[in-house]
Amino acid sequence: MLADFTRRVSRKTPETRASKGFWRFGSRIQVDINTVNNVSSHPVVENNNVNENSENEPLPPFLTLSSQIDSAVPDSGFCDKLSCTFTPTGICDDRLREGLSMLSEPNARGYYLKRLGGKNDRIYRQSFEILKMGGERHMALLQMNPRRTEHHFIRFELNPSEIGMDGVYEVKRVFKALFGERFKVDLSDGNITRLDAAVDVRKIRPDDLMVFSTSARQSGLFQRSFDTSGHETFVTETHTVGSLSSDYFARCYDKAAQVWRVKAEEADGLITRVEVKLKPRTEDGATLRVGDIRNARNPFGALMVAYYPTSGESNYVFNLLVAAARSVGAERALKMIPDRRVRAKYWNLLRDSVPNWWCPEKHWDEVLESLKATGLFSRDIFRKK
C-alpha cells in the first residue's frame, strides 16, 4: 500500500554540476516503507558517477556522508545580510562631494568607492560599491540622494558574516569620513529595510528534517534526483516557507551542496542552513526603526524545524501524512487534511519531534549579539527593554 503511494507535481530539471542528477521541483516520487519508518532516502555511497569520458568520478562529500541526527549541533546564529536607511544631520553638500571625490580614488587606506549606474540608480541617484583594494573585494553597497523625498538620504547594504569584522571596520571608516563621527546616532533614527538571520546546523542534511510555519504560509520543497544502481534516489535539498515577495521568507537548505556547486569547494562535513529573510515592521505595518531593533519580532519564532516522526503501527493515516510530507513538505501535507481537529492533532504530533537543538529565542539573541559586535550601531539599542 504505502510502497505504491505516489504523487505527481510539475517538473523543472536544470542540470547541476555535482553529478548526473538534477534539480526537480517535482517528479513521480515513490515512497517505500523505509520512508515512513524514518529512514532517509540518501544516495548509497557506491560510486557510479560517470563523466563525459565514461570515467568514474568520486562523488562530492555532501552526497556520500551520512547524517548523525543524534549528534547534530547548531553554530551561533548570525546576520547574513543587512540593509538600512538613514539621513545624516549637519552634512553640507560641498563636504559630501569632496569626501566622495577623495574616496573614489584608490589610495593607501585599503578601500575606495566605485561608482555604479544602471538599475542601481532607479531609486537613488548615486550608487557606489565599497571595495577593498588588492583584489577589489566587495564590502558594501552605498546609495544616496533618493528620487522620492520621503525616503531617507542614505541606504546601505552589507553582509556582516561574509566580510567579517575587518570588512565592517572599513565600512565604518567610510561612514565616518562621509557623514561624521555622529553617524551612529543618525543611524539609530533610520530604518531597517532588510535583515537576514541564519543559523548553521552541522552533521545533518535537510532530507532529515521537516520545516513548517506556526501560521498558514506558502511552502515548497525542492528535491534532487541522483541516479545510482539503475534507479533514482530523491534527496530533499531545500525547504521554503513564505513568499519571496513577502516580508517573511525562510529557507532550510543544504549549504554544503551550495558551496560545492557555486564555488566548487568542499565544505567541512554536512551543513544545513536555516535562513530567514525579514523586512522588519512595527505592529501598524511601518518599517522598523534601527533604534527599535529589540522590538523586532523573532524571525525564527514562526518556524518549526522537526525530525520525521517514527511511524506508529496503529495510526496508518498519520503514517501516510509523514510519507506525503517527504514528497510535498509538511505544510502542504497538513493542508490535505480537511478536518480541522484531525489536522490540529497531527500538527501537535509533528511538534513533538522538534529537536532540542532548535531554540528560536537563543538563535535570535545570537544574531543580535553578532550585530552588536560589529560596532556599526550604538550599543544602547541592543539593551533589553
Model-found features: residue ranges?
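Structured, helix-rich domain cores that form ligand/interaction pockets
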Residues: L2-M336, D352-K385
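Helix-turn-helix DNA-binding segment
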Residues: R340-K345
